[in-house]
């Protein structure tokens, strides 16, 4: 407990919380609207699957986290089979610490949230070197809930296809229709097909999918 920690331990934990809080605040306040080029271009992993479990805890360094396990149906980017587990910053809800204090460091507003059993598509950054935490690209923008044959991120897909230029010769009719979506759910099969082709064909690297402006 904090009341029994040595001064050095207290300072170490305080430093961890300060550094983590600063990085979280910076990420939250600086998030801009991202489109498909950004999501694909900045992701290390792109996973389509079902949320198996969502738990939370506090690691040995005192960093609060939410742990998510995905049953992976398809890894659109990355060599992942079966299940994938990652942790992002923040608790699911405030937690009593048993020493008269309450840890209020919950998942920040605008970050991806998860529900057991939901089908989802995730665009994930690489794990942070220091904390091991991992978040979706653009926070809530990089997590899509699949429902009723549609896929939609936590920003209702606003700006997802804005300023996206793709060589027309690469697109089938359903992908072309998907690109017309300005807001709201996009057909999940068309969206997954589009992302799969972009990754496998290295469209961004070849300049065949790019920012229009």
Task: Provide a role label for each language-model segment.
Residues 2, 8, 13-213:
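Transition segments tied to proteolytic processing and entry into folded domains
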């Amino acid at each position: 407990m904090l009341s029994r920690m040595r001064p050095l331990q207290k300072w170490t934990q305080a430093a961890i919380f300060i550094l983590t809080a600063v990085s979280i605040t910076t990420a939250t306040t600086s998030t801009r609207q991202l489109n498909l080029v950004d999501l694909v271009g900045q992701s290390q992993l792109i996973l389509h699957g079902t949320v198996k479990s969502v738990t939370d805890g506090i690691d040995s360094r005192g960093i609060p986290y939410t742990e998510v396990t995905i049953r992976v149906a398809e890894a659109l980017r990355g060599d992942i089979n079966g299940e994938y587990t990652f942790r992002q910053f923040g608790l699911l809800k405030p937690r009593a610490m048993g020493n008269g204090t309450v840890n209020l460091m919950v998942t920040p507003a605008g970050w991806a949230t998860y529900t057991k059993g939901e089908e989802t598509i995730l665009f994930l950054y690489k794990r942070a070197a220091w904390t091991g935490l991992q978040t979706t690209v653009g926070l809530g923008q990089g997590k899509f809930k699949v429902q009723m044959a549609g896929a939609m991120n936590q920003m209702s897909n606003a700006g997802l296809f804005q300023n996206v230029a793709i060589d027309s010769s690469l697109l089938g009719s359903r992908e072309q229709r998907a690109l017309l979506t300005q807001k709201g759910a996009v057909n999940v099969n068309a969206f997954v097909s589009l992302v799969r082709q972009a990754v496998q064909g290295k469209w961004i690297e070849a300049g065949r999918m790019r920012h229009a402006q």
